Regions:
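Short hydrophobic alpha-helices and adjacent helix-cap/hinge residues
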Residues: 1-335
Length: 335
């Protein structure tokens, strides 16, 4: 009887200790009276859902906006000089952490904030850049969430071939100056060669370049392309570029393989990408570790899962019959 009483007492004490520990663990962010300042730089409006996911994730972790954490959110559309000015202001303001996205702003943030020893969390691609040392050990004062843009572009090319094996001329517009373009092209060209596909490349420097090329093709007896694969770079997904691409595709019954979630309801027959809000929440989890003292460069990059989404009506309008084997791979069908 005494043994049973002792065991019950021990269990009760242990449960109480765990409960108290969990309570204070949850209260730590406010109990230590520390206030954090986080500078957020988004290089394009299309990535705002990632920022929203980041803030939401920080809320879940116990950070209270206007209480123990303050955000300076700066949104710029593909303006490299503005990226630098914004990060310089973050440095002058002595923020505790910088959250930068996508690739270009992250590269600028790393360079500008290096001497200030401000940790950086980013969401972006790493291929073809020196932004990190490796996936497992980013190094220096940076870590984050990897988008895997080149890999998704290559996989989408394979999916296009699976859906429409007769389509041999694949239109590939891209920003020739974007940091990951070379790495993307190397991978996509390799896949195209293996599948015996002809990439009709358009190296562009502006939205006007894309618009002009599509207008030129529209006047030809043969437009010279069978389908369109969108590469991971902001230029092609900016409003004027995207409007021109979707209008052209609709007129000529072309399939568009997109690279952003919102494109599934805006002209793309299918997209293969990670969920933006989830990426933001993953970045928040990393930021939390850094704010509690773990060196940024020691935290491995996170690589989120790619999800295949299909707009069934869009595919049908383009005259495409989706096979059962293809549909089995789909994570979400929009009708």
């Amino acid at each position: 009887m005494n043994n049973k009483l002792i065991i019950v007492t021990i269990i009760t004490v242990l449960v109480a200790m765990v409960s108290v520990s969990l309570y204070f663990l949850g209260k730590t962010k406010t109990a230590n009276n520390k206030t954090y300042k986080v500078g957020i730089l988004s290089g394009s409006d299309i990535f705002i859902p990632i920022v929203d996911g980041f803030v939401k994730g920080m809320d879940k972790l116990g950070y209270v906006q206007g209480g123990n954490i303050f955000y300076d959110v700066q949104k710029v559309n593909a303006d490299h000089s503005a990226f630098k000015q914004i990060v310089e202001k973050f440095v002058d303001d002595k923020v505790d952490l910088i959250f930068a996205l996508p690739t270009e702003p992250a590269i600028v943030a790393k360079a500008v904030a290096k001497d200030a020893n401000i940790p950086i969390v980013f969401v972006g691609d790493i291929e073809g850049t020196d932004i990190v040392e490796s996936v497992s050990h980013p190094g220096e004062n940076i870590t984050g969430v990897r988008i895997s843009g080149p890999q998704s572009a290559a996989k989408r090319l394979e999916l296009v071939h699976e859906i429409l094996p007769q389509a041999k001329r694949i239109y590939l517009p891209y920003d020739k100056n974007y940091p990951i373009t070379s790495a993307t092209l190397e991978l996509v060209r390799s896949v195209a060669k293996a599948l015996n596909l002809n990439l009709v490349e358009l190296p562009a420097e502006s939205q006007e370049d894309i618009i002009a090329d599509l207008e030129r093709r529209d006047r030809l007896p043969d437009i010279g392309i069978d389908d369109i694969v969108i590469t991971p770079n902001p230029l092609v997904t900016m409003p004027l570029s995207w409007q021109a691409i979707t209008t052209f595709a609709q007129k000529h019954d072309l399939l568009i393989s997109g690279t952003l979630v919102n494109q599934i309801n805006n002209g793309a027959a299918f997209v293969l990408t990670s969920d933006f809000e989830s990426m933001g929440e993953a970045a928040a989890s990393i930021a939390d570790k850094i704010l509690f003292g773990i060196p940024a460069g020691s935290l491995p990059l996170e690589t989120p899962t790619l999800h295949l989404r299909v707009n069934y009506s869009q595919a049908k309008n383009a005259g495409i019959e989706l096979s059962e084997s293809f549909l089995l791979k789909v994570d979400e069908i929009v009708r």
